[in-house]
Amino acid sequence: MTLPMIMSCGMYYSVPGLRDLCHDVKSRNDDAFTDAAEWLSRVIDKYDLEGYSVIPIPNHSGRAEYTLDILKRLRRLRSIRICDILVGAAHATQYDAKKAGTRLSLNDYGFELRGDIPFNRAILFDNVIGSGNTYFSAMKTISFKTSLLTLAQTHPTAYYANQWSKFE
């Protein structure tokens, strides 16, 4: 079974409660991690993830923090392999860059792999996909196309597929 480009709980602005959940996750609300894992478990139940490693994408600190916390909660609910091997450079948040009238480039993340991906089968995980830059930068770092598991997306999947074609 081929996985879709994006596996999400829904659209950020239109699914009731999803935007608030994403904000609570970024605030490191412990209950939000559990709720996020429950939402994500319903998404991954639709797919066969056997043999895949789920890689948490680091936040602006350069480390996977809340993304890793959510995946650990998800692993309590579903059998998933977590591979915390992606690190990055500390950088501005997308939100702060947007407020400043700029946009982060793919190079601003400074992602590096610190280990091997078992079977070269990976799924990236991030809280929200907005512009797609974080996802695309992480995908370029691992050197092969991969799906993204995310709580929410701000655009339809076709938008991201079109954006990705510009980087190939």
Residue locations for each model-derived region?
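Active-site-facing substrate-recognition patch
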Residues: 1-52, 87-119, 131, 154-157, ...
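Short histidine/acidic/glycine/proline-rich micro-motifs that form metal-
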Residues: 27, 58-63
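Short glycine-rich phosphate-binding loop at a beta-alpha junction
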Residues: 50-60, 122-123
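Hydrophobic anchor at the start of a short beta-strand
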Residues: 52, 80-82, 122, 145-147
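Substrate-recognition/cap helix-loop segment adjacent to the acidic, metal-dependent catalytic center
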Residues: 64-82
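A short, conserved beta-to-alpha structural element at the edge of catalytic cores
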Residues: 96, 136-140, 144-168
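Conserved Lys-Pro-Asp/Glu-containing loop-to-beta segment of HAD-superfamily phosphomonoesterases
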Residues: 120-128
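Acidic, divalent-metal-coordinating active-site segment for phosphoryl/phosphodiester hydrolysis
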Residues: 128-138
